[in-house]
Amino acid sequence: MKNRLSLLLTLIVAVVVISCKKTINYKNTSDFAGDPTDYFMSMQVGKYATYRLDSLTFYFYGQLDTTTSYLAKDSVEKSFTDGSNNQAWLVTRYLSDLSGSSWTASQTYTVTPSTQQVWVTENNLRYLKLASPVTEGLSWTGNSALPYAPYQDFFDYSDDSHLSLGAWNYTYQNVAQPYTLGTTKYDSTVTVLQAADSINVPIVDPRSFASKTYWIETYAKHIGLVYRHTAMWEYQPPTPNGSQTGYKIGFEMTMTLIDHN
């Protein structure tokens, strides 16, 4: 169960970007805010970022929900040359309770950065987190490298937005704008809205299907990811004959940066 939870957390925390729909000569564009790597964690051995993870899950046959909080530390461990002869980096994710007194290696993933894009590969799922150019309104099909129904081993989704993730459009928002988290203010950030769709949310009619799909990330310049909120859950209504009560499946998670070097 612990290994399954670690794998699920790793899958949840990962995000992708793949191909741009809009072509801009970004080096000559006045609103060009930097290369994608300017907004990603610096790939140097010893670099780390620590986050608080607040994870909402459903239990008791989807009748109840609970929020569990963790600490997650992503640490750059080493560099290597990948199969395409590109420099890549191995990152290990460690998990702890909120005390941070004991850390356990959860998963590893690889990062392949360039001035044009930042690729991430986790559990054989290939993601492109940031695309070029970093300009307001740039949109791209961010999940086109994912297979159909990538989370189906964990959740029996039925909503197409949870199955055909390749159709998601990512969009840059609030490019080069300040962003405040608690008492910390970041001078220059970019937000990536990946999905924002819902059906019957909040649930006003418990006799009808409901679904929530929301995925947003904010990156700070020269720091990396500072905030992520994800939600992919569904509500199945009771059967007409009463043989099955209504229930929820899926997850919702908030990830907030609390420390980095």
Where on the chain are the PLM-derived regions?
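C-terminal motif of bacterial Sec signal peptides marking the signal peptidase cleavage site
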Residues: 16-19
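Conserved functional acidic sites
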Residues: 21-261
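Bacterial N-terminal signal peptides that target proteins for export
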Residues: 1-9
